[in-house]
Regions:
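Residues within the DNA-recognition helix of helix-turn-helix
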Residues: 13, 68, 75, 125
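Histidine kinase transmitter module recognition
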Residues: 2, 48-50, 64, 99, ...
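Conserved phosphate-binding and hydrolysis motifs of nucleotide-dependent enzymes
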Residues: 81, 115, 127, 131-134
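Key DNA-contact positions within bacterial/archaeal DNA-binding proteins
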Residues: 70, 120, 135
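Helix-turn-helix
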Residues: 60-67
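Terminal helix-turn-helix DNA-binding modules in bacterial transcription factors
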Residues: 41-60, 74-119, 139-140
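Core residues of bacterial helix-turn-helix
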Residues: 10, 65, 114-115, 126
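Short, Lys/Arg-enriched, Trp-marked, Pro/Gly-tolerant hinge/linker segments that flank
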Residues: 2-46, 50-51, 60, 78, ...
Length: 140
């Protein structure tokens, strides 16, 4: 029994050495802290996706990720190619467009459902994002 445990331990160490040799040569750093940060960022992103109408703030998102505001902004931008606020805005507007087209909601109702308190602000953001007004979705 002890021989099997020793063999298993040696195999695990050998595999670890191979992984470090392969990835280390390519400049890939195996960093458990970075993995934890990535998991936390994914969790925060999933929470935003799950509750688009919630009035998320950068401070709250950073706190949920266990990062400072500045560090959260930098790491989110690096991980996803856009700021958390830009990401949230785009997801809200995409969801609103789906509500307008598929559920035939009014512009005001769609705006409220995705977290916009003021339909005029929603309409402006929608127009900037898509290049046409939200009311155009109701005509299609």
């Amino acid at each position: 029994m002890a021989g099997n445990a020793t063999q298993l331990l040696l195999s695990a160490h050998a595999a670890e050495i191979v992984v470090h040799a392969l990835f280390g040569e390519r400049g890939i750093v195996l960093d458990p802290a970075a993995d934890l940060q990535r998991v936390r960022l994914q969790s925060v992103k999933a929470r935003m996706d799950a509750d688009l109408a919630y009035p998320w703030s950068i401070d709250e998102l950073a706190r949920n990720a266990g990062l400072s505001r500045r560090s959260f902004n930098q790491k989110f931008q690096m991980a996803y190619g856009e700021s958390a606020i830009d990401y949230l805005r785009a997801r809200r507007l995409d969801a609103a467009r789906d509500l307008l087209i598929h559920q035939r909601l009014s512009v005001t109702e769609a705006a409220f459902r995705v977290g916009y308190a003021h339909p005029a602000n929603f309409a402006t953001a929608f127009r900037r994002h898509f290049g046409y007004s939200p009311s155009r979705c109701q005509r299609t």
